[in-house]
């Protein structure tokens, strides 16, 4: 065979082969790039979802909780004395954003023929409302002072819809004491976080009401909520705070107070692994 003819045929065949495979290679590269982009986007979406849920839980309960050392798991707190020195000491720690007093008490809302179990969270005039400001959909957050108990109360949209309550409406909460005790509140605002575990039951009112209902002194509270700067170090911070409080108190991280939520969030990491694999 003529050498020139042989070389020409080989070059022609190679060119035809390149023309045939080039679109396939381009499609394959595009598919790989799209897959990688989807994986990266999925990881970011899942990470954002976990962060959003965590921040909402922090908004309801802080990062670290200080309460009476007991085995009480109910919404009826064992009282502790508010300690100004302890509060100042903890707030001076470089990783602490703020510390605030609270107490909780279970009750039943009754409106016409509707009833609903709720948890009244009592807070004082120093409470940080920033989380609820961000999630407020109607009205305003309550304003309390250090002298007279206020009847203003903040409820969720879920409670508002179930009980047909709006801003400015009167609301009765019954507390199962002996005998049953009732308190009248006025709805000052309505919030919505989308976290039904809390939205379904949580109302925010004046700490003084819980103190009176429980026959506590004015200096007695249910506990402290603490916000810290870096959640990743929460276990370390919890240990440091636990070492600084009296033996009859305990410091508990929010991860251990609501383990079911954070265990579920941790399971979402497996979804990331599945996506990456």
Where are these regions (language model features)?
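A short beta-strand structural signal in non-transmembrane regions
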Residues: 64, 160, 219-240
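A structural signal for hydrophobic secondary-structure junctions
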Residues: 84-218
């Amino acid at each position: 065979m003529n050498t020139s003819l042989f070389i020409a045929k080989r070059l022609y065949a190679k060119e035809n082969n390149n023309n045939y495979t080039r679109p396939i290679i381009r499609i394959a590269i595009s598919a790989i790039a799209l897959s990688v982009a989807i994986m990266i986007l999925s990881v970011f979406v899942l990470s954002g979802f976990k962060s959003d849920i965590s921040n909402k839980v922090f908004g309801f309960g802080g990062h670290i909780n200080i309460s009476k050392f007991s085995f009480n798991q109910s919404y009826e707190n064992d009282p502790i004395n508010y300690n100004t020195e302890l509060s100042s000491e903890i707030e001076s720690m470089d990783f602490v954003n703020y510390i605030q007093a609270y107490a909780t008490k279970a009750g039943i809302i009754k409106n016409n023929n509707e009833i609903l179990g709720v948890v009244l969270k009592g807070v004082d005039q120093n409470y940080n409302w920033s989380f609820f400001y961000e999630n407020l959909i109607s009205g305003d957050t309550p304003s309390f002072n250090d002298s007279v108990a206020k009847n203003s109360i903040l409820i969720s949209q879920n409670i508002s819809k179930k009980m047909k309550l709006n801003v400015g409406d009167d609301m009765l909460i019954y507390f199962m004491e002996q005998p049953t005790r009732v308190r009248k509140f006025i709805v000052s605002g309505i919030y919505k976080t989308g976290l039904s575990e809390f939205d379904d039951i949580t109302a925010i009112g004046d700490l003084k009401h819980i103190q009176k209902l429980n026959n506590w002194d004015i200096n007695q509270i249910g506990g402290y909520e603490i916000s810290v700067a870096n959640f990743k170090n929460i276990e370390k911070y919890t240990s440091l705070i636990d070492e600084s409080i009296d033996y009859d108190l305990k410091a508990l991280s929010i991860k251990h107070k609501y383990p079911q939520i954070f265990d579920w969030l941790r399971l979402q990491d497996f979804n990331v692994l599945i996506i990456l694999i």
